């Protein structure tokens, strides 16, 4: 494998995981903050708020997992490496 392609693949894999984690990380922090605020304001709605929060966390975390899949594809099944 060409060393330039190998180096670019490693850099791209690191960037894909890092950048894919920034957005969901900030979103989860914001959502958790608003959930705590909502529960503090209306404690009887805790169950509904928690359910919606966990579902939204799952959707946000799926974006990070997609970034991890792209990174693993670049590292172990690199389509740019050729034969």
Curated annotation (Swiss-Prot):
Residues the record marks as site: Reversibly protonated during proton transport: 61
PANTHER family according to UniProt: ATP SYNTHASE LIPID-BINDING PROTEIN, MITOCHONDRIAL, ATPASE PROTEIN 9
Subunit and partners: F-type ATPases have 2 components, F(1) - the catalytic core - and F(0) - the membrane proton channel. F(1) has five subunits: alpha(3), beta(3), gamma(1), delta(1), epsilon(1). F(0) has four main subunits: a(1), b(1), b'(1) and c(10-14). The alpha and beta chains form an alternating ring which encloses part of the gamma chain. F(1) is attached to F(0) by a central stalk formed by the gamma and epsilon chains, while a peripheral stalk is formed by the delta, b and b' chains.
InterPro entries named among the record's database cross-references: ATP_synth_csu_bac/chlpt, ATP_synth_F0_csu, ATP_synth_F0_csu_DDCD_BS, ATP_synth_F0_csu_sf, ATPase_proteolipid_c-like_dom, F/V-ATP_Csub_sf
Bilayer topology annotation: Multi-pass membrane protein
Name assigned to this protein: ATP synthase subunit c, chloroplastic
Predominant location: plastid
SUPFAM superfamilies: F1F0 ATP synthase subunit C
Note: In plastids the F-type ATPase is also known as CF(1)CF(0).
Subcellular location: Plastid, Chloroplast thylakoid membrane
Domain of life of the source: Eukaryota
GO molecular function: lipid binding; proton-transporting ATP synthase activity, rotational mechanism
Segments traversing the membrane: 3-23, 57-77
Functional description taken from the UniProt entry: F(1)F(0) ATP synthase produces ATP from ADP in the presence of a proton or sodium gradient. F-type ATPases consist of two structural domains, F(1) containing the extramembraneous catalytic core and F(0) containing the membrane proton channel, linked together by a central stalk and a peripheral stalk. During catalysis, ATP synthesis in the catalytic domain of F(1) is coupled via a rotary mechanism of the central stalk subunits to proton translocation. Key component of the F(0) channel; it plays a direct role in translocation across the membrane. A homomeric c-ring of between 10-14 subunits forms the central stalk rotor element with the F(1) delta and epsilon subunits.
Family: Belongs to the ATPase C chain family.
CDD domains hit by this protein: ATP-synt_Fo_c_ATPH
GO cellular component, one term: chloroplast thylakoid membrane
Gene designation per UniProt: atpH
Keyword tags: ATP synthesis, CF(0), Chloroplast, Hydrogen ion transport, Ion transport, Lipid-binding, Membrane, Plastid, Thylakoid, Transmembrane, Transmembrane helix, Transport
């Amino acid at each position: 494998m060409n060393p330039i392609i190998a180096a670019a693949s490693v850099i791209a894999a690191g960037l894909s995981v890092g950048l894919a984690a920034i957005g969901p990380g900030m979103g989860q922090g914001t959502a958790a903050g608003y959930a705590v605020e909502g529960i503090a304001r209306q404690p009887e709605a805790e169950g509904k708020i928690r359910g919606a929060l966990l579902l939204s966390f799952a959707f946000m975390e799926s974006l990070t997992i997609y970034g991890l899949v792209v990174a693993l594809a670049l590292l172990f099944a690199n389509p740019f490496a050729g034969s």
